[in-house]
C-alpha cells in the first residue's frame, strides 16, 4: 500500500505544478478599456488663464536663451548648448516645417514636466493615456522669414528664436496604445484640452512658465521662466 502511494507521489507533484502554472498564466483581459472620467473641470477662461503676451515671452526668452541663429547650419554648431527634442515617453514631436527640434536644457526639462504631469493627470481622472504634441520649437532667422511669407501675421520678433519657447497643440494629441494590444477607448480632443489646461494653469501659477492661448494656431505658446531649473 505504501509503495503504491510512493508511485503516485511524482504524478501528484506534476499535476499540482501544472495547476499552479496555469493559474499563474491567467489570460490578459483584451476587452475594450473604457474611460471612467472624473473631476474634469478645465479652466474658467482660456484667454484669462493664459494671458501672457509676446513681449513678456520675449523678455524672458532673451535672458535664458541663446542668441538668434541665422540658419540651420548655425544651429547644428550650437548643439552642445541645446537639448534635442524628439518623441519620448512624455510627448510626441510633430513634423516641424518652420522650426528645428532643439531647446535650451531648462526649457526641455519643463517640456518633460508638462508631458509627465499630463499623463499622470489623465490616469488620475480615469482617462486612457495620450501624449501632448509639440508643434513648434526653435526657429532660425530663415525659418521666421519663410513663416512670414506664408503667414503675414507671424511676428518678426519671435520668442521661438531663443530656444526657450515651444508650442503645444490643444487640437491634436497622440493616443498611447496598450503594449499588449488591448483596445483602448478614445478620449475626445475637447476632453484632453480641458485636462491639459489644468496642468498648464498649475505650472503657470507655480511661476514655471509664461503661457499664451493661441486660438488661430490651435496651440499653447509656452516660454520657460528663469526660476525653472532642469530636473
Residue ranges with predicted function:
Residues 110-125, 150-153, 171, 199-206:
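Structured segments of extracytoplasmic/periplasmic soluble domains
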Residues 142-167:
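Short, surface-exposed glycine/acidic/tryptophan-bearing loops
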Residues 1-33:
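Bacterial Sec-dependent N-terminal signal peptides
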Residues 80-128:
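Active-site acidic/histidine clusters and adjacent loop/turn architecture
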Residues 93-105, 132-134, 178-189:
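Second-shell loop/turn segments in exported
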Residues 227-231:
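Conserved small/polar residues in nucleotide/adenosyl-binding loops
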Residues 126-128, 158-164, 213-216:
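Extracellular/periplasmic catalytic domains that process cell-envelope and extracellular macromolecules
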Residues 127-144:
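Acidic helix-start/capping segments at beta-turn-to-alpha-helix junctions
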Amino acid at each position: 500500500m505504501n509503495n503504491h502511494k510512493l508511485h503516485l507521489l511524482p504524478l501528484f507533484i506534476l499535476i499540482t505544478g501544472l495547476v499552479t502554472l496555469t493559474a499563474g498564466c491567467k489570460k490578459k483581459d483584451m476587452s475594450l478599456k473604457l474611460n471612467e472620467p472624473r473631476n474634469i473641470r478645465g479652466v474658467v477662461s482660456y484667454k484669462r488663464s493664459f494671458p501672457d503676451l509676446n513681449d513678456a515671452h520675449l523678455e524672458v526668452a532673451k535672458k535664458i536663451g541663446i542668441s538668434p541663429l541665422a540658419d540651420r547650419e548655425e544651429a547644428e554648431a550650437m548643439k552642445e548648448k541645446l537639448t534635442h527634442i524628439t518623441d519620448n515617453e512624455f510627448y510626441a514631436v510633430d513634423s516641424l516645417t518652420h522650426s528645428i527640434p532643439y531647446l535650451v536644457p531648462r526649457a526641455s526639462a519643463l517640456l518633460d514636466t508638462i508631458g509627465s504631469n499630463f499623463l499622470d493627470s489623465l490616469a488620475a481622472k480615469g482617462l486612457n493615456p495620450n501624449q501632448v504634441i509639440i508643434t513648434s520649437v526653435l526657429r532660425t532667422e530663415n525659418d521666421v522669414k519663410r513663416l512670414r511669407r506664408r503667414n503675414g501675421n507671424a511676428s518678426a520678433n519671435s520668442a521661438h528664436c531663443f530656444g526657450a519657447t515651444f508650442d503645444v497643440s490643444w487640437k491634436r494629441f497622440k493616443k498611447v496604445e496598450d503594449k499588449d494590444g488591448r483596445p483602448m477607448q478614445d478620449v475626445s480632443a475637447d476632453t484632453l484640452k480641458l485636462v491639459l489646461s489644468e496642468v498648464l494653469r498649475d505650472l503657470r501659477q507655480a511661476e514655471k512658465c509664461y503661457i499664451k492661448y493661441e486660438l488661430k494656431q490651435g496651440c499653447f505658446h509656452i516660454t520657460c521662466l528663469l526660476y525653472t531649473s532642469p530636473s
